[in-house]
Amino acid sequence: HAGFDAPTGSLMAKLNVEGSRVMPRLAKELDFSYMNNGSLVVCMDEADYAKLERLYQNGLKNGVEGLEIVRGERLREIEPAVRREAYAALWAPTGAIICPFGLTVALAENAAANGVEFIFNTAVTALRHEGGAWSVQTDKGLIRANAVINAAGTYADVLHNMVSTKKIHITPRKGEYMLLDHAAGGFVKRTVFQLPTKLGKGVLVSPTVHGNIIVGPTAEDIFDRDGVNTTQAGLDAVRTRADIAVEGLPLKQVITSFAGLRAHEDGHEFIIGRAEGTENFFDCAGIESPGLSSAPAIGRMISEIVAEELKLEKNAAFIPTRKGITELKKLSIDEQNVLIRQNSAYGRIVCRCESITEGEIVDAIRRPVGARSLDGVKRRVRAGMGRCQGGFCSTRVMEILARELKASLADITKSGGEAKLITGLAKQEAEKYETI
């Protein structure tokens, strides 16, 4: 997000603009995909033009650069897929797209390189401040810490309210999406929004950095803090509203659908800083859209607050860069041949839809904070993200995971925890019955 939508003067507006400005440099330093494609907010009716003008003025006050209200041929020149009957649009040339998985993994790997230790699939059950430090009770034991940073998403209010005198409330707001095949990839060049409402920015149509088209989301307040299931009603709503601003959207090219949750705080504002009535307990709560765009600025802000409170010094040995996984399909033929001669695993295609090699999958597993599940591999190198959604490559990826992790195939999970994909090996089961 460029930063034109958040209320002027809010922390959300400030950090959105700052984060968006930092993202290109961060993409270079941490080697993740970033594309400055620009965004449009489309006004279909003259009666709504005042709303578009207010959005434009709001963006100017927020410090968003290059904003322009466009019409007619100028609008069609920027994005030919916008409906010809569109009255006007707000053009934000600083709008951009990234892969959320790519950014998250890049940050995690860089953190690991700088000494951060990760403990996954662990739930906090209690928090106590005693002896000048925090005792964090989890379902896997006790952790002692000088400070706690609460970035628990839809659970951030639960942890905050365990310790703070000032309570907060977060509502999980579900958004359902559809993803279109690469074959539809050229349908739009820009991220096309509809005029926003109090629930969000409407159903967008946007390219992804990997060449797909993404359509969504809905905005439904729910009670389930983990409720990421899709629904027929939600997907029908996406389908109905998707082509309001664009014409001829090829929805027959949908290859998957999914849902995510926004951690909506009642005041619709980021809560960042020390929690009231606590010592060294810090919140990053209510981080909903534009949270992804704001992430670099949020990270900087909370690190500065914590450093000041704890009198921390800068790490002189900090490693600021990270090299991502080599993508064979992005190399020239000569470069591919050199790499394959060095490591033959890069000559074996495992995921045909996305042209992902065994070498890339092995790298994803062996790296710091490496993949430990089918989804872990998928989110790092996209094996299983293509047209067949893992129908052909899942078993092969599982075999590579089992080999690299020295684990049984039956222990490989879809996404960690107890999400096992098979109950046992057929040959072993047959032999067991033969001995009865």
PLM feature segments, named:
Residues 90-147, 155:
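Helical element adjacent to the flavin cofactor pocket in flavoenzyme catalytic cores
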Residues 63, 106, 196, 200, ...:
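C-terminal catalytic lobe of FAD-dependent flavoproteins
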Residues 1-74, 78, 202-203:
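Dinucleotide-binding Rossmann-like beta1-alpha1 core, especially the glycine-rich loop
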Residues 44, 152-153, 285:
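Glycine-rich, N-terminal phosphate-binding loop of Rossmann-like dinucleotide-binding domains
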Residues 226, 357-368, 391-409:
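Iron-sulfur (Fe-S) cluster-binding segments and ferredoxin-like electron-carrier domains
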Residues 7-8, 13-17, 44-51, 90-112, ...:
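Short beta-strand to alpha-helix junction loop
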Residues 378-394, 411-435:
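Short Fe-S-cluster ligation motifs
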Residues 127-216, 220-231, 240, 246-249, ...:
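Flavin-dependent oxidoreductases
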